[in-house]
A protein has these predicted regions:
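Soluble extracytoplasmic domains of inner/organellar membrane proteins
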Residues: 105, 122, 128-130, 136-146, ...
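Soluble, non-transmembrane catalytic domains of enzymes that act on hydrophobic metabolites at membranes
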Residues: 1, 59-62, 158, 177
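Residue-level preference for the first positions of well-ordered beta-strands
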Residues: 72-74, 146-150
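Catalytic core of membrane glycerolipid acyltransferases/transacylases, capturing the structured
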Residues: 22-41, 54, 69-127
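Short gly/ser/thr-rich secondary-structure transition/capping motifs
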Residues: 54-62, 130-131, 188-190
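A cross-family acyltransferase "interaction/gating" segment
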Residues: 109-112, 145-148, 157-214
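A transmembrane-helix-recognition feature enriched in membrane-embedded lipid enzymes
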Residues: 1-60, 112
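Glycine-rich helix-loop-beta junction characteristic of Rossmann-like nucleotide cofactor-binding loops
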Residues: 64-68
């Protein structure tokens, strides 16, 4: 339980202390948007690595050499834990936005950070709004920003390896021609979800497959 409390406290403090940092980055972005974006990417990656350290999470990364570093891609992965985002974002070699459920927009501070990091919010129950999100993701990729989507549309809480993919999950790659990088995450649910609210130190394996040309 102590690990969970420490990780939560660190995350909250980071979000609060980071407010003036966001303001400074916003000013920098007026003159050099890329420099501001890269700075925020590295800051958040550092914070996520600290959270993983506090939680005692040990990572084995397989196939990271398959991830292109010179072009935007669409990451596609299975989704069993909130920690999937923390784990995979900490490994991104370039700017990457995540597609999150629409309800995340209501979370104070976190939604501000997510928006600044090019994350998008999707409402799958509203076809028009969902299409707007996909189009925004296409624009991100065209502007050199990778995107990550969990095509199951929600965390998989079943015994099945994966849930059916939601419609439109691959549209961003189809419309931009960017490579698709498949990710397989194993063991992440054992950090928290398997025994909520306790956090336990576990071994998580992340495997990146070879890029797929749509």
């Amino acid at each position: 339980m102590l690990r969970a409390i420490l990780a939560l406290l660190f995350a909250i403090l980071y979000l609060i202390i980071g407010i003036p940092v966001l303001f400074v980055e916003w000013i920098i972005g007026k003159f050099n948007r890329q420099a501001a974006d890269i700075s925020q990417l590295r800051m958040v990656q550092w914070a996520f690595r600290v959270i993983l350290f506090i939680c005692g999470t040990r990572l084995t990364i397989i196939g990271e050499e398959n991830v292109p570093k010179d072009q935007p891609v669409l990451y596609i992965g299975n989704h069993r834990s909130y920690f999937d985002i923390i784990i995979t974002y900490s490994r991104c070699p370039r700017l990457t936005g995540y597609v999150a459920k629409d309800s995340m927009k209501k979370v104070p501070l976190l939604s501000v950070w997510m928006t600044r990091l090019h994350c998008l919010f999707i409402n799958r129950s509203d076809v028009k709004e969902a299409l707007k999100t996909i189009l925004a993701g296409i624009d991100n990729i065209k502007n050199g920003i990778s995107m990550c989507i969990f095509p199951e549309g929600t965390r998989n809480k079943t015994e099945d390896l994966m849930l059916p993919f939601k419609e439109g999950s691959f549209k961003m790659a189809e419309k931009t021609g960017c490579l698709i990088v498949p990710m397989a995450i194993s063991g992440s649910a054992d950090i928290l979800e398997a025994h909520f609210p306790k956090v336990k130190p576990v071994h998580v394996i992340v495997e990146y497959g070879k890029p797929i040309d749509p």
